Amino acid sequence: MASQVNALLLPVIESTPLHQITKVALTTTLTSKQSDYKFKEIAVPLTKSLQLYEKAQRRQDLRASLKALESIIYQTHFQWNNPLPRHAHLFQKHYHFLLTHWPFENHRDLVDSIAVNNGKLNSTSSRSVWLKADWITLFNVKNPWVQTPPSLMRLSGTDLDTFTPERIFLINSLGNHYKFLIANSHLSYNHKKYPSPGVQIPIRNALGEVSPAKQIAQLFARQLSHIYKSLFIENPPLSPENELALTAVFYDETVERRLRRLYMRACARAYTTTNADSTTEPLMFHCTRWEVD
C-alpha cells in the first residue's frame, strides 16, 4: 500500500514550491521502513493538505494555498520528522510511576478542610502553585486509586515508587516544559491556555460522595494523555537537527522573500531545548528566533 500511495504523493510534493530541505525530509519520512499505522499517520493528513493546496491553486486562491503549505511545513519539521525529546521517551518509560504519583486535589478533602482553616479554601489547583512549587514535592504523594498491574508487580528488582535520578530528571523537565509554555503563551496550539495540570477529583453528589475508584483512576489516565498531547504532539520542541535544517532554509540566499516569509509564519511557534543532551540537569527551553529580512 505504501509504495502505491508514495507513487501518487511524491510527484505532487516535488511540484510544490517548498524548499528542497522540506521535500527531502518528507520523501525520506514517507519512504522509510515503518508500519502501516505509522505510514497512515503521515500519509493521510499530508494527502489532505496536498489536496487543499492543489484545489486552491486551481481556484487561484493564494491565501488557502499558502495555508496548506504552512501546514505541511509545520507538520514535516515539528511532528512527522521531529525526534521526540528525552523526557518524552522517559514519560512513556515511567508512565505507571507518573500515573500513581501525579498530583491531585480531592474536592471532598478540600471541603472538609475548610473548618480547620478558619473557613478558608486552600486549593492547590491554581496555575500559580504549579509555577512556583518544586515539582518533586508535588509528586511525593501516591494516589490510592490507580492499581499496579500484575505484570509490573512481577518484575523483579523494580521499585515502582522510588524517585530514581531518571524519574527526578523527568519530573523536573516536565515542570520546566510546562512553565515555559505558560510563560510563552504565543507558542501554544490555537492560542490554547494551559490549566493547572493536577487531577481534579470532584464531589459526585450532595452527600459529598466521590466517584468509584475505577472512574477516578481513569481521570489520571486522561490527564496524562492530555499532558503528553499538549507537550509533545501539539507543541513539540524543535529538535536541534531540525533547527539547523530550518536555519539553512532561512539563510539560503536563493530562497525568494515570499517563500522565506511562508516559512517564518509556519515556524512562528518554534522553540527548542538549550541542553538537549543533558541526562542529569533537567531540560531547559528557549524560543527560536531567526533574524532574517
Swiss-Prot record:
Protein localization: Mitochondrion
Signal peptide annotation: none
Annotated keywords: Mitochondrion
GO CC annotations, alphabetized: mitochondrion
Any one Gene Ontology BP term: mitochondrial genome maintenance
Source organism superkingdom: Eukaryota
Coarse class of the protein's main subcellular location: mitochondrion
Stored InterPro entries: Gep5
Function: Essential for respiratory growth and required for maintenance of mtDNA. Required for cell survival in the absence of prohibitins.
Family from the record: Belongs to the GEP5 family.
Protein name, per record: Genetic interactor of prohibitin 5, mitochondrial
Species name: Saccharomyces cerevisiae (strain RM11-1a)
